A protein has these predicted regions:
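Glycine-rich phosphate/pyrophosphate-binding loop and the adjoining helix
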Residues: 49-109
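Helix-loop-strand module that forms the ligand-binding subsite of alpha/beta enzymes
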Residues: 1-67
Length: 109
């Protein structure tokens, strides 16, 4: 996990900010109820490597630990993750296409 993400998680999940351990404000009664969250990530490998049976396993299953234990825990609605595969080797044209797909996914929220 990147250090910047770990720092964000530590601040968000500080007792009294992201949840309250005394009043048990979590999941359906979380402080962030009514908010939405989307994970956006890139990979260096092809999509096939991140599918069930692929070398790395289903990426969406790996991301569930973040979406469930952080976003859902705080009461957020989890939106589908936006994943860009093979980002390190993409052409400018494909980069522009991926950017348009990402813009569309944001506009469709």
């Amino acid at each position: 996990m990147p250090a910047i993400m770990k720092g964000w998680i530590d601040r968000i999940l500080a007792p009294g900010f992201g949840f309250n351990p005394i009043t048990k404000n979590a999941y359906d009664t979380g402080f962030f109820k009514g908010k939405s969250a989307m994970l956006v990530t890139t990979t260096g490998s092809p999509k096939e490597m991140y599918s069930e049976g692929g070398g790395h396993g289903d990426l969406n299953k790996h991301l569930e630990s973040i979406t469930h234990f952080f976003f859902e825990f705080m009461g957020m609605k989890v939106l589908p993750s936006h994943i860009i595969y093979e980002a390190s080797s993409m052409s400018r044209e494909r980069g522009a296409e991926e950017l348009e797909k990402y813009k569309k996914s944001l506009l469709d929220i």
